[in-house]
Amino acid sequence: MPTTLETAVAKYLRSGNPAQRTREEYSTTLRKWARWGNTIPIENLGRKDIRAFLDWVYEDAAGRDGGNPGRTANKVRSHLRAVMAWAWEQDMVGALPRFPKVKPHRVVAGRHYLTKPELNALYFASHQMTRPRGWSEPFSVGRYWRSALVVFFNYGLDTGTVWRTETFHEPIRCRHVSWDRQSPDREVKEQSPWGWLFYRRLKTHKAFYRPMNRTVHAHIKNIMPDDPDPEAPIFLGGGTRPNKRFRTLCGLAGIGPKTNIETGEKQPWVLRDLRKTCATYYDEHVPESSVEILGHSAGGVTYRHYAHRAPLAFRAIMTLPQPSAFAALSKGFDGQCPCCRRRFADG
């Protein structure tokens, strides 16, 4: 028996027990669907139908108040995609339809990601980081932070995966790095010429074997001791409060606090924002790739489907355009500006 969108939404909401505000938003989407007047069952819902509905939502919103029709259409798109992804997981539909791109819209919320010029500024400002009291490590603290910025950008890691600040954190250790082309996970068919990195998400404890691209490879090599202890953490210099040092780094880079548009409140950037930055640039590069790379469960898609997304994640990681500053090391310009060759003095 064909499944209507109304039935699918009701089952989807019952499965997740969302907040009342979320339920109301989905009800609004269903009212728009009813006013559109097309009763296509979800089994037959395709990209062409979805585009037609979203175009109607956009035009309807523009005709009613004209405030921000793109945002309205994109909100409806996110609801449809979440329901269809859940229906796919439940085997209610044979395949997840491709969705049209999001529509241009006026940003009404604060920006929660860092731009590439800001990442460049952070990277170069790390040369100004002062030596912490009692620092006796072989490399400057700035060198560790430059490598950390690179892995935050490329993998969207949790802070506790880079620097262990709590007893339950599992940081990346020297034994978690493999320089082989073949992944330590033998189920992974792809081969990486730059090696592999293992880590585990704090929230879900899910293990990941990720390929290193050229930029990550160069920065991991740059902080790896000649005779590494397999149990030693790779990244040092976070201290007991990495976010405090990150705020200092933002100050050195001349990056002001972000602004909450609703309240006007100034809020400092935190390391979690680098995770949001990672998701932003991955989805810009390869749409939907951040779901797998960050280890999210989006729209009810569970990990049993992620095996099919592994090639997508591999391609996204290996081809992600990097901030220009990140290329300085791999091009042989470590410690100097790649454009003017001005040398930086590490603290």
What is each stretch, according to the model?
Residues M1, C174, D180-E187, D226-D229, ...:
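C-terminal secondary-structure termini that scaffold catalytic or DNA-interacting sites
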Residues P2-L30, N68:
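Short, aromatic/basic-rich helix-turn unit that serves as a nucleic-acid recognition element
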Residues K32, I40, L45, R64-K101, ...:
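N-terminal DNA-binding recognition helix of tyrosine site-specific recombinases/integrases
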Residues N74, V93, F99-T159, W163:
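Basic, Lys/Arg- and aromatic-enriched nucleic-acid-binding interface segment
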Residues K101, Y155, R164-N222:
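Conserved tyrosine-mediated DNA breakage-rejoining catalytic core shared by Y-recombinases
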Residues V150, N154, G160-T161, D273-S297:
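C-terminal catalytic core of tyrosine-transesterase DNA break-rejoin enzymes
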Residues F168-W179, E265-P268, H285-A307, D334:
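Short, polar N-cap/turn motifs at the start of nucleic acid-interacting alpha helices
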Residues P211-K266, D283-V286:
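Active-site/catalytic core of tyrosine-dependent DNA strand-transfer enzymes
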